[in-house]
Amino acid sequence: MWLIFSPIKQHRMSLAIQKATELGVSKIIPCITEYTNIRTINTKNLYFNAIEAAEQSERLDIPKIEKQIDLRSLLLKWPEDRKLVYCDEKINNGKSIIETLTPLKDSSIKWGVLIGPEGGFSDLENELIAKTKNVVAVSLGDRVLRSDTAITVSLFCVQELLAK
């Protein structure tokens, strides 16, 4: 499972990387969006957070942390053999995340989870994401979550519902 997220404040980002590592993410990709507030990140610090979390959770590997990439480039290069769970508070398809994801359970499918910046994605970005192949749009509920909370919740749901 991959995590794609918009960079956030250092303390919250460190916490998000720790939780993502504990939840078994294999790759972490910082993604710059229109509303991203933090434009430069220290990937070395993120790597150290991942090492610490891997040790704590008795994980034998450490997720690969990619260089940051802009959303458009990420979507243009998105692998055809991997689905992208797109989490956004504006999605209202009348279904819960469980109802949306459970029918997609297939152990051969590879997954990525996309979490946007605080403030969400721009209208243009929402259109771009919606037009991308293999995107599964989900809502994480009625409440607007902080990015680090949304990362933990979404990864747990995908892992429990799909990745087993």
Regions found by a protein language model. Name each.
Residues 87, 92-95, 115:
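Reductase modules of NAD(P)H-dependent flavoproteins
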Residues 91-92, 118-119, 142-145:
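Short, acidic/turn-prone active-site loops that include or flank metal/cofactor-
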Residues 74-80, 97-106:
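Short amphipathic alpha-helix with an adjacent loop that forms part of the alpha/beta core around
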Residues 41, 95-98, 147-151:
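Short, charged, surface-exposed secondary-structure boundary motifs
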Residues 19-23, 101-104, 128-131, 154-155:
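Short, solvent-exposed amphipathic alpha-helical segments in soluble enzyme
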Residues 1-86:
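RNA substrate-binding interface of SAM-dependent RNA methyltransferases
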Residues 123-164:
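Structured adenosyl-cofactor binding patch, chiefly the S-adenosyl-L-methionine
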Residues 108-128:
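A C-terminal functional module that forms or caps the active site or interfaces directly
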